[in-house]
Amino acid sequence: MEMLDQSLRRLQTDHLDLWQVHGMGFGNDPELAYRKGGVIEALEQAKQSGKVRFVGFTGHKDPEVHKRMVELGFPFDTVQMPLNCFDASFRSFEQTVLPELTKRGIAPLGMKPHGGRAGAIKKGIVTAEEMLRYAMSLPVTVTISGVDSLDVLQQNLRVAQDFTPMTAAEMQAIRDRAAPVAADGRFELYKLSLKFDNPEARMAHEFPLDPQSVEVREMVAASENTGRPFP
């Protein structure tokens, strides 16, 4: 709550429309969030006090963590997650989490519509416009697309202004086109690499902050030798 109060002072406002717990992705994050004194209590206090209107959580690593967060029962207003045509074939938030949110009336916020990288677009597997339109055609409340240039902004605006949802057949055709290179996660490295972990979450789990450190490399090597996933 202290962090929320600091944000309100800096923003010079008395409330936030949406307050989300950032970067849920480690296997025991749900249990830590729901324990006594955990972040769920802070979300409850924030809503009850009127300091926030809506609360949710984000994450890009593991759909099972998202699903567990929801199944434990707190009435989240929003859940933010990566949704794109490559996700459908690898650790899929679309397949695992999206139906659960729809069932519970929780607003899905789709992020990383282009997979977080431009590799697939550069290789000609799909176009940027196709990927954005695919993500917007899913049953989401909003699609969040990163913009790093005026050209990208104009491209996104064109897709939005001319938007018509893809048919089920069109969406399946794009999934099928992406599947041969999607199944190993090469275009969704945020699900695999420590480089994309939230630093605060890494510290909470006592991981070194530098993903290139010797300690991390040793842990990854040990994981490869035992066949156990890391993290």
Go through the PLM ranges and name each one:
Residues 1-92, 96, 102-109:
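Glycine/proline-rich, positively charged
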Residues 72, 96-231:
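Structured C-terminal cap/extension of enzyme domains
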